[in-house]
């Protein structure tokens, strides 16, 4: 059991404590986006995942189905936003939209851009690709083989890190190499956004599977609620596929920040108190970790407080 749950304190207080620490004591910094942040370096959160528990925030609505659709898209290795837009998921739309506007001078609306991505395959191929982001590295990390005379060629099939972790958890649970890495130095420049939630590691203790996520850069107000859900979901899926019980999720942040233009959201959220104990049920066990569908997931006991919004920094 998590020490936080044993103490009787609601799991979400640690998130709110981190938010308050950053907002009240963080260093103000000029960041890549030009928006400005308050930031701390080095943070840790821990969540109990037993009995269906998930780190789903209650002090604002977190759209867990949207986060799940994004996560399942990662597992496909797809890097084009078209499948996401077709499901109404706009998490990644702002980056291709920004590039399209800059290169064409067309001040198209986000809604119209997304609709065109869905309707026009050629347009999506030209403007909807993000480069070799997250899922591509997770399931198709490039491998180069020698062909003689000091030359190399890319192997058709790359490394499927997710499949390798499933295999190692099943056959060598005591290994310290259960890792999924997204930070491919050679391909960073080709990515619309370098991976923020970059390194996942897994640990088996008895029949319990624990997971750790290291995040190099973390937007606490908008990104972290989705990142926590995705990391916990990955632990849950791996546990089910490997006949283990979910244990604990440990989250570690590097540059952990709040954007200055998120002030209204931060102050509203810090005025609220967490409540409830949502649980996630996985309704089906497919033959592979790559076979899950959105219909396989059901959340109960989730009654979040009102929606809070803020702009995304691109």
Swiss-Prot record:
Reaction it catalyzes: dUMP + (6R)-5,10-methylene-5,6,7,8-tetrahydrofolate = 7,8-dihydrofolate + dTMP
Binding site residues for dUMP: 32, 176-177, 216-219, 227, 257-259
Where is the catalytic site? 196 (nucleophile)
A single GO cellular-component term on record: cytosol
Q: Where in the cell is it found?
A: Cytoplasm
Sites binding (6R)-5,10-methylene-5,6,7,8-tetrahydrofolate sit at 219, 313
| Highest rank taxon of the organism | Bacteria
UniProt GO molecular function = thymidylate synthase activity
Kindly give the InterPro entries that the UniProt entry links to this protein: Thymidate_synth/dCMP_Mease, Thymidate_synth/dCMP_Mease_dom, Thymidate_synth/dCMP_Mease_sf, Thymidylate_synthase, Thymidylate_synthase_AS
Q: Does the keyword Methyltransferase apply?
A: yes
Q: Which UniProt keywords apply?
A: Cytoplasm, Methyltransferase, Nucleotide biosynthesis, Transferase
Q: What class of enzyme is it?
A: transferase
The main location is cytoplasm
Regarding protein family, the annotation reads:
Belongs to the thymidylate synthase family. Bacterial-type ThyA subfamily.
Q: How does it assemble?
A: Homodimer.
User: What task does this protein carry out?
Assistant: Catalyzes the reductive methylation of 2'-deoxyuridine-5'-monophosphate (dUMP) to 2'-deoxythymidine-5'-monophosphate (dTMP) while utilizing 5,10-methylenetetrahydrofolate (mTHF) as the methyl donor and reductant in the reaction, yielding dihydrofolate (DHF) as a by-product. This enzymatic reaction provides an intracellular de novo source of dTMP, an essential precursor for DNA biosynthesis.
Question: This protein is called what?
Answer: Thymidylate synthase
Please tell me the species this chain comes from: Novosphingobium aromaticivorans (strain ATCC 700278 / DSM 12444 / CCUG 56034 / CIP 105152 / NBRC 16084 / F199)
